[in-house]
Amino acid sequence: MEILKLYKQQLLEEIQNLGYESLRYSIFSDKNPGEWEVVIEFDKLEQLYFIYGTMDRGSYNGKHSFKTFEEAKIAFLQFLYDIILINKYYVEQNMPTNYYSPLWSKNPPDIDPRISQ
């Protein structure tokens, strides 16, 4: 759908404006989401937008449905913001974070240079 391409572009621009590029997210993708992603999908049959977060590849936190893109957009961006807040809390409490992001981690993880990324 052409409108979903436009909506995806809008979300990508918002993500860039907010400085959220290092976060994990999936926007109207046909592929299965990865670990720790915030996902926005559109169900053509139900005509609903769904927002949810994945944990590992096989599980997710409850799906929230929205009738309009504007509602879904706000929820998606809020979810990303909440990911930042929770991981900042984890850092403050010396707990492991879900993944590395400069938005909450002071130092990048130690990466073995012999392992290709």
Give each language-model segment a name:
Residues 62, 72-76, 87-88:
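Short, surface-exposed linear patches
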Residues 1-33, 114-117:
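Negatively charged, low-complexity tracts enriched in Asp/Glu with abundant Ser/Thr
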Residues 28, 52, 61-63, 92, ...:
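Local beta-strand/beta-hairpin segments that build beta-sheet-rich folds
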Residues 5, 63-67:
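Conserved aromatic
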Residues 67-81:
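A short, charged, amphipathic alpha-helix used as a generic interaction element across diverse proteins
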Residues 32-62, 79:
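Short aromatic-glycine-(Arg/Gly/Cys) micro-motifs in beta-strand/loop hairpins
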Residues 82-117:
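Intrinsically disordered, low-complexity charged/polar segments
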